[in-house]
């Protein structure tokens, strides 16, 4: 089974090397290196590994902005245009690490070749979430050091105080889109990837609607797919409440002090109990003990 891993990275080459070595040998890795980072450091580290494909289209990534979707779609494009056919396109970050062995990962995807591991929730259900996505985040793509950031943030707050809300549905042509949220990490078939990429390339009104939302990378693919009757039933929809474990179906993630926690050996038991394929985030030094425990488990 041929898998394509679509990896976003910006730091910690040592961790990236460790990640790639732990994934199935027959895989191909498509990498986006943040434009702020020196790509030559990454290329030098993988000089002799023909499986590593660095995409030329690089983005100066700003967390929470639409340009996270931009690089994600360019990774999808690179995989679809590659000379070989893949069974799955799997999005991960360079700070992920597989909890499962190479063999377990391949066997998992071989069991159900049609299921799409892309989860979402209709944001109009939980009140707190709907309130967030009714706000205009004009400042999200602005550098915090510039005056534009503060002006646009003040404008967004003024709209909120005036009760001016961003709609949770958008009519584009003869189709009405509802807003769905999930995670930026998913594993999908090339057929579905083509549908999502086509919308990115052709549906400017959809992109404009999502542009001023918080974290469009957690919205774009989900909104495209869950508004498509052909694909909706093949994905994972939760109609009740937002659940981080459900919306990251293959990845263990936990938060600490409003940030994704850098995992260490104290997290090992919870990671194993989650039965997730990956955990994130891990970093050289701080997570070395955890990686050692996972490696020992795989060798038993």
Report residues per predicted region.
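ER/Golgi luminal nucleotide-sugar-dependent glycosyltransferases, focusing on the catalytic module
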Residues: 1-300
């Amino acid at each position: 089974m041929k898998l394509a891993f679509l990896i976003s990275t910006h730091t910690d080459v040592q961790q990236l090397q460790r990640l790639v070595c732990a994934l199935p040998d027959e895989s191909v890795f498509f990498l986006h290196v943040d434009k702020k980072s020196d790509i030559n450091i990454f290329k030098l580290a993988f000089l002799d590994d023909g499986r590593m494909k660095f995409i030329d289209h690089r983005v100066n990534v700003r967390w929470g902005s639409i340009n996270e979707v931009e690089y994600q779609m360019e990774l999808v494009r690179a995989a679809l245009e590659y000379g070989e056919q893949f069974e799955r396109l799997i999005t991960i970050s360079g700070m992920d690490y597989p909890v499962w062995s190479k063999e377990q990962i391949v066997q998992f995807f071989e069991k159900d070749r049609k299921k799409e591991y892309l989860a979402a929730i209709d944001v109009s259900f939980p009140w707190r979430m709907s309130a967030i996505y009714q706000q205009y985040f004009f400042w999200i793509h602005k550098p915090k050091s510039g005056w534009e950031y503060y002006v646009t943030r003040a404008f967004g707050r003024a709209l909120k105080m005036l009760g001016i809300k961003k709609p949770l549905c958008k009519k584009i042509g003869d189709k009405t889109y509802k807003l769905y949220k999930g995670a930026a990490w998913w594993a999908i078939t090339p057929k579905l990837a083509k549908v999502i990429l086509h919308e990115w390339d052709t549906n400017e009104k959809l992109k404009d609607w999502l542009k001023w939302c918080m974290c469009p990378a957690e919205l774009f693919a989900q909104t495209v797919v869950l508004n498509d009757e052909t694909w909706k039933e093949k994905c994972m929809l939760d109609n009740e409440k937002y659940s981080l474990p459900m919306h990251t179906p293959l990845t263990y993630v936990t938060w600490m002090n409003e940030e994704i926690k850098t995992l260490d050996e104290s997290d090992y038991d919870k990671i194993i109990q989650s039965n997730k394929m990956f955990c994130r985030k891990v970093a050289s030094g701080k997570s070395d003990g955890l990686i050692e425990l996972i490696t020992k488990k795989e060798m038993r």
